[in-house]
């Protein structure tokens, strides 16, 4: 999953980027509203974390422009202003959720999971497929009730394929949700992650369509 983080506070932004990356998200971090609009136009994101008080263009202006273009990207707004009017303005401008600073990283992560779950149409917090259970909150995977050790990027690949069962995802689509724009990408990184997942969860779990991509088929 790829997140656009828009936060001008250096200390907070760095902490959020590191924390979210450790949770398995690919994070692009920008520090002003103009840059946010450029990144929104150039990349595909699953969620945006947007501070209200930004230089060059405010978070509310960025949000209104996004919604005005018909963009349905989930947006979690951050603010230091804890008044009802501020919250109402943010939500009425199109925010999906609202978090007041200071906040706990665990709460932010839980709100992100809820927004992503809502967008994918899931009501249950865990994902089940055959004898596999994946829990995004704990980053845990079990097979036939037994824990399976999964590396963070393997987990991210598995989550993306499970949330898109029946849909073929190209290597480029998988890479886009694994890496931020600053990361160096090995040419065969996705293939390596797929290979490891097959060894751990079954050779027939992920199907390859040569020249097209990878898919986990829906259960009959």
Task: Give the predicted meaning of each segment.
Residues 1-122:
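N-terminal/domain-start alpha-helical segments
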Residues 2, 110-168:
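Short, Lys/Arg-enriched segments at the junction into DNA-binding effector domains
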Residues 9, 42, 60, 81-83, ...:
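A short, glycine- and basic residue-enriched loop/turn
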Residues 24, 109-112, 136, 178, ...:
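Short amphipathic alpha-helical/adjacent loop interface patches that line ligand
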Residues 30, 128-130, 135, 142, ...:
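Solvent-exposed beta-strand sheet faces enriched in polar/charged residues
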Residues 70, 119-123, 165, 182, ...:
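A general structural signal marking secondary-structure boundaries and capping sites
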Residues 140, 145-205, 210-212, 218:
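Positively charged, aromatic-enriched patches within helix-turn-helix-type DNA-binding elements
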């Amino acid at each position: 999953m790829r997140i656009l983080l828009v936060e001008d506070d250096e200390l907070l932004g760095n902490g959020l980027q590191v924390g979210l990356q450790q949770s398995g998200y690919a994070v692009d971090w920008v520090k002003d509203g103009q840059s946010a609009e450029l990144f929104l136009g150039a990349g595909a994101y699953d969620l945006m974390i947007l501070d209200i008080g930004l230089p060059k263009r405010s978070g509310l202006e960025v949000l209104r422009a996004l919604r005005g273009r018909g963009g349905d990207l989930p947006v979690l707004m951050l603010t230091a202003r804890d008044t009802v009017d501020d919250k109402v303005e943010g939500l009425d401008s199109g925010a999906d959720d609202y978090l007041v600073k200071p906040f706990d990283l665990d709460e932010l992560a839980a709100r992100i999971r809820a927004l992503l779950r809502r967008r994918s149409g899931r009501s249950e917090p865990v994902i089940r497929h055959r004898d596999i259970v994946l829990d995004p909150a704990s980053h845990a995977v079990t097979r036939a009730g037994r824990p399976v050790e999964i590396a963070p990027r393997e987990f991210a690949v598995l989550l993306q394929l499970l949330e898109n069962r029946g849909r073929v995802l190209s290597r480029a689509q998988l890479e886009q949700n694994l890496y931020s724009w600053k990361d160096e990408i090995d040419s065969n990184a996705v293939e390596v992650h797929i290979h490891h997942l097959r060894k751990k969860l079954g050779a027939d779990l992920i199907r390859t369509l040569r020249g097209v991509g990878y898919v986990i088929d829906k259960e009959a």
